[in-house]
Swiss-Prot record:
Belongs to the complex I 20 kDa subunit family. Its cofactor is [4Fe-4S] cluster. It is a peripheral membrane protein. This is NADH-quinone oxidoreductase subunit B. It is found in: Cell inner membrane. The gene is nuoB. It comes from Geobacter sp. (strain M21). PANTHER family: NADH DEHYDROGENASE, NADH DEHYDROGENASE [UBIQUINONE] IRON-SULFUR PROTEIN 7, MITOCHONDRIAL. Binds 1 [4Fe-4S] cluster. Keywords: 4Fe-4S, Cell inner membrane, Cell membrane, Iron, Iron-sulfur, Membrane, Metal-binding, NAD, Quinone, Translocase, Transport, Ubiquinone. [4Fe-4S] cluster binds at C37, C38, C102, C131. Its EC number is 7.1.1.-. One of its GO terms (cellular component) is respiratory chain complex I.
Length: 170
């Protein structure tokens, strides 16, 4: 299974990290978790005018099919265990986007019942400020998430050199 002939003109070499990260960033499947008015702007982002599909971003209704969760709106302390459960059901690797002032910092609701930022419970990768943020802001935030994914280091072990043979695992 090794390379028996020299590389031709139409051959591209790359690292496995780059290839996997390109595939991951080109097919983000977010789980929507709209809790307030930010959810309306999130729905507008998925509509024809902004068309998230052109970026490979397709909303999923099941956490088991999603690799990103967009927390949009006010998170109450009663809702927090549900959000954590949904997050735990998502397969690895997974990313979190906090959309809106309420998800980022609690917004104007400085009360005992509102979580003052979802980052108290989940590791947030991208913050999108605004009340509510415009669809363009969500698009920009998702493109920043794509940039972050493209630069991640994966742990795929050692690389296989050119001309080396792969042996099946025992």
């Amino acid at each position: 299974m090794g390379v028996d002939q020299p590389l031709g003109e139409n051959i591209i070499t790359t690292s496995l990290d780059s290839l996997v990260n390109w595939a991951r960033k080109s097919s983000i499947w977010p789980m929507t978790f709209g809790l307030a008015c930010c959810a309306i702007e999130m729905m507008a982002t998925g509509a024809a005018k902004h068309d998230l599909d052109r970026f490979g971003i397709i909303f999923r209704a099941s956490p088991r099919q999603a690799d990103c969760i967009i927390i949009a709106g006010t998170v109450t302390k009663k809702m927090l265990p549900v959000i954590k459960t949904v997050y735990e059901q998502m397969p690895e690797p997974k990313w979190v986007v906090a959309m809106g002032a309420c998800a980022c910092s609690g917004g104007v609701f400085d009360t005992y019942s509102v979580v003052q930022g979802i980052d108290e419970a989940l590791p947030v990768d991208v913050y999108i400020p605004g009340c509510p943020p415009r669809p363009e802001a969500l698009l920009y935030g998702l493109m920043k998430l794509q940039d972050k994914i493209a630069n991640e280091r994966n742990s795929f072990g050692s690389s296989i050199g050119l001309g080396e043979r792969l042996e099946p695992a025992a």
